[in-house]
Amino acid sequence: MNSLVKNRVFVLLLLVAVSALALAACGSSEEEKEGIVEGEPVALGSLEYNVLFTRPLNIDDVEDSQYLVGQPDPDPGTAYIGVFIKIKNTSEDEAHTLPTSFELVDTKGNTFENIPSESIYALKPGMEVGEEDDVPAIDSAAQVGPIQGSMLLFKMNDEAMENRPVQLVINGEDGPATVDIDL
């Protein structure tokens, strides 16, 4: 066999091996549920969560005022954090319930639970999501708003925001998932 044929055979075998490896990874039944990044959906049971955007909210900023309806000024050294999320119930025949709470956790293990919100953009933890429904609901203020997602509201201290990456913990039907949020 001449060297040109040997090289072609080698390249072909290498491509077959790489393709087989890629296909084997696609067949994995256990989806990764840790270290998800914003914009990457994660399925927990029939509910698919997608964290779109995270940012500190300023109570004195006109743009943020609708997200912070009814909230007092934050204590010195603390800030409000808005985590904007979309959720899809992929079940064709069954409603599913959202977790009753969500948490932000910094690298030192400090935990911050979402706080109640009166905002029209707020996600309501513990709510039922109908079969094949979306949160936020189609044509709702949150869905047609600037971010097009429902908001989870948190209050964090400034020190914890520096302990990155901060993760959103979602305790769903199939156990927890963690999403690295961009603060």
Residue spans of the language-model regions?
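Sec-dependent bacterial lipoprotein signal peptides
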Residues: 1-24
